[in-house]
Amino acid sequence: MSGVNDIRSAFLNYFAANGHEIVPSSPLVPRNDPTLMFTNAGMVQFKNVFTGVEKRPYQRATTSQKCVRAGGKHNDLDNVGYTARHHTFFEMLGNFSFGDYFKDRAIELAWKLVTEEFGLPKDKLIATVYIDDDEAFGLWKKIAGLPDSRIIRIAGADNFWQMGDTGPCGPCSEIFYDHGDKIPGGPPGSPDEDGDRFVEIWNLVFMQYEKLPDGSRLNLPKPSIDTGAGLERVAAVLQGKHDNYDIDLFVALIRAAADLTGADPHGPMKASLRVIADHLRATSFLIADGVLPSNEGRGYVLRRIMRRAMRHAQLLGAKEPLMWRLVGVLVREMGEAFPELQRARPLIEETLRLEETRFRKTLERGLSILDEKSASLKKGDMFDGETAFTLYDTYGFPLDLTQDALRARGIGVDIASFTDAMEQQKAKARASWSGSGEAATETIWFPLREKLGATEFLGYETEIAEGAVAALVKDGKEADSLKAGESGAIVLNQTPFYGESGGQVGDTGILTGDGVRVRVTDTQKKAGDLFVHLGTVEQGTLTPGMALALEVDRARRGAIRANHSATHLLHEALRQVLGDHIAQRGSLVAPERLRFDFVHNKPISADELRRIEDIANDVVLENGEVTTRLMAVDDAREAGARALFGEKYGDEVRVVSMGSTGRQGAASNALGWSVELCGGTHVKRTGDIGLISVTGESAVASGVRRIEALTGHHARHHANDAIQLAKTAAGELRTTLDDMPPRITSLMEERKKLERELSEARKKLAMGGGAASASSGAAGVRDVGGIKLMARSVEGIEIKDLKNLADQGKKQLGSGVVALVATSGDGKASIVVGVTPDLVTRFSAVDLVRKASEVLGGKGGGGKPDMAQAGGPDGAKAGAALDAIAAAMGG
């Protein structure tokens, strides 16, 4: 049971046998906590359960939670590789009680697991309790039989946990393992507690109070338990190691990296191998959970981790991208426990390979500048922060890499001056933005939103309504009126017009009132939820307070609805065909077309596109009801509703479901086949979409693909046009539609054969006496000052073939110069000049070809003294170019 996978299973199975629900790890991107960059503890997914906001069908749970600590307050990045127990990625084993058992049972369960199931010697274990937690102190004596000397009271925050400034909180109790006096360090609470002898392997949190805003505490009516045990630490103890990087999992990853680089796992570069092993886990799991490298937010933290590992790969002498080649080893070690690794393996490998390929140039340039700027520094000196910022800002060289590179030399970085330079740049950016006309125009909407409040949106239920003009805006300022012929922005108290958001374009339509008619050309959302109608007054004068009839262009809205619903179906179909790593990165929902951007690192094959289209159309043909529910955002996410990464949602969200629950891949909560958080407008039944036709697929950014499609009559017209085009082509080929593919294949093969024959004929013609210069002999060979010059002009021969012909010409002449000009159908010319070996000291092919290039309108040429090439746009002067070569030879 000493392997990492065995230990994980033993922990979960032990608590399952004791009435706990085994709950899968939540993603590294927190679903219900916008304050967290990454999931960093086992209790994160249960936060709302502990606070009473959410109810679960169980009162006891156990998990092995994926965690990342590499950004914000919890940031272990700089220490990774240099200490025994710091990691960017780790697993947190835990058991939880939601108002069920409390201290006595928690201590009993933990003690039995570590001593009976794991078999740790009791005399190697000590416990800590909060300084005034007499109850826990007594329980450790009673249940574990620990003497007073091995129960240590600890004051301060280390042994008292709280969720925030207010809310659930309580004392902690920790279990420590004693590695023995061969390892330096003292027990917890002692002056030398930071040594490695005593290692915390489990923390039990007793949530028994609620902290109030005034700082006072009340007893919770139902106290709860939250525990956390780092799997890597537990494994080290059970495997007889005092260093986490010596456990079986890390040994496998480190050995694989060492095999690929030739590094000694126990040599002077072992820290670099450890960095690579640790960072491989963090990057792979983050990518599997939908995070991609970028220059902001979670993507930037991922990029920093990746680049730090890549820098250490470079230190190990890796000449080619390394990280992606290690993913298979990680999947072998952890893929059974975390199937998402296996599903996302192609995406992980391709993302790592591309990122490392791009970063190598940045790394080489940055390290070169860093070496130059720090050459005069010695141990203990500080590297200039402004220069560090220039490396970051101009060359894309992250600060932590600068620090890491200088660390080995004992040189620090002046963080204060780095921060000052960063703030100065931000100030310049803000000044530039605030001085723009766009910024001045946009500022009008915030005070209007404060004054008028949110616009009430009626468009989910109707496309015709009545409303009153709340405000008019023209040229960035409030206006008293808009007259006939004038354009501006109209804010209404309520509207059926959808404001552009979530990828869906804004509505258009007509506003009419007493002698007034306004054509709305777009609707936008400003300052959050202020709907702004952009349009032109066609008749009358529009003034604030005027009552209007509001009518959305219903045909256009209907097409938009179909495209938006089709986007949802394509999203789910993409996931089924390509994998669970598919995550939305953007979309456009317009009346005539749709596009959907998503995470994927390689082109989609024609077969995959057809399967995606077929799956989506199968749901259309079901003609099932499209249901919309209003739900609490946390409930919606817990129910499996998909959300757009980075999108901000309110406390209550609309959940759009479509497709029967019996379909493959349907949500387990029975809400539907496709379930998404969405504020857009949708069809009532999937059959209203009519037809989905995928028209294209392309790349839009690194690791992001785009799929484009049509629906309804646009899709029908597209299909009809394609069929008619195919029929026309079949008619031209004198065949049927069914026989057209083999007919085209046959014609293409015949064409290739004819092209080969034509090429050979041209070559023979060229060497047998193609068109010569005006002063050449019949065979294109003449005497220039006693030197033979073969000068010929030919058509339709490629440059590579010209070189071969020039070599043949040199052999024919024995001694001499060969000049061949080939003209193409667009009038351009290519020229090759060859000089036999005995003449290269007298004539340079490079010099001669450049003389010809000038005549052809080109810009020089290049090559070697015995063979050079050039070109030019004016092929009509081929003969003159050959004469220029003869003149340069002295003829």
UniProtKB/Swiss-Prot annotation:
GO terms for molecular function: alanine-tRNA ligase activity; aminoacyl-tRNA deacylase activity; ATP binding; tRNA binding; zinc ion binding. It is an enzyme of class 6 (ligase). InterPro entries: aa-tRNA-synth_II/BPL/LPL (IPR045864), Ala-tRNA-lgiase_IIc (IPR002318), Ala-tRNA-ligase_IIc_anticod-bd (IPR018162), Ala-tRNA-synth_IIc_core (IPR018165), Ala-tRNA-synth_IIc_N (IPR018164), Ala-tRNA_ligase (IPR050058), Ala_tRNA_ligase_euk/bac (IPR023033), DHHA1_dom (IPR003156). Zn(2+) binds at residues 564, 568, 678, 682. Its EC number is 6.1.1.7. Keywords: Aminoacyl-tRNA synthetase, ATP-binding, Cytoplasm, Ligase, Metal-binding, Nucleotide-binding, Protein biosynthesis, RNA-binding, tRNA-binding, Zinc. One of its GO terms (biological process) is alanyl-tRNA aminoacylation. Its cofactor is Zn(2+). The keyword RNA-binding applies. Binds 1 zinc ion per subunit. Its main location: cytoplasm. It is found in: Cytoplasm. Catalyzes the attachment of alanine to tRNA(Ala) in a two-step reaction: alanine is first activated by ATP to form Ala-AMP and then transferred to the acceptor end of tRNA(Ala). Also edits incorrectly charged Ser-tRNA(Ala) and Gly-tRNA(Ala) via its editing domain. Belongs to the class-II aminoacyl-tRNA synthetase family. Consists of three domains; the N-terminal catalytic domain, the editing domain and the C-terminal C-Ala domain. The editing domain removes incorrectly charged amino acids, while the C-Ala domain, along with tRNA(Ala), serves as a bridge to cooperatively bring together the editing and aminoacylation centers thus stimulating deacylation of misacylated tRNAs. NCBIfam families: alaS. This is Alanine--tRNA ligase. The lineage of its organism: Bacteria, Pseudomonadati, Pseudomonadota, Alphaproteobacteria, Hyphomicrobiales.
